Amino acid sequence: FGDYEDAVNQKDNILFHSALSPYINLGLITPEFIIKKVLDFHKSKKIRLNSLEGYVRQVIGWREFMRGIYQSYSNEMETGNFFKQNRKMKKSWYDGTTGLPPLDYAIKNALNFGWSHHIERLMILSNIMNLCEIKPTIVYKWFMEMFVDSSDWVMVPNVYGMGLFSD
């Protein structure tokens, strides 16, 4: 994490990430547990400050911010469609045969692992879905089906708000 937290590389689909989101989102481990482990590790190994701060910020800052957005605005987000997008999703979105290599790679990651790097989700998958004018509820359904860390409180603000700007 830190310097390369937003880097995407086809040789390593996790790359500088813990991939703990399924465990956190399902309630199997808590953010508090993770932060304690990270801080304990930092005491003995001295993690670079930007890496430590970036990781802690993501685990407790961003996650909790998204949860607050969901609790406060989920109804509006789930019914919003600011750009009036109404296209359906083609079969290629489910098998990774769109013909766009970065998109197909991201789809196949989701199919193979049930998980994708946050940049793949936001900058590749969501961005292209938005450019293709796919209906937000269809995009939301796709994300809920494809990822093991999918949960309403996570996907509603990330898909409707961050990914599609549909709210």
Regions found by a protein language model. Give the residues of each.
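Structural helix-adjacent loops and short alpha-helical linkers that scaffold large soluble proteins
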Residues: 136-137
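Generic helix N-cap/helix-start motif at coil->alpha-helix transitions
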Residues: 118-119
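Alpha-helical support elements that line or immediately flank enzyme active sites
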Residues: 125-129
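Catalytic cores of enzymes that engage adenine nucleotides and/or redox cofactors via long glycine-rich
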Residues: 1-114, 130-131, 142-166
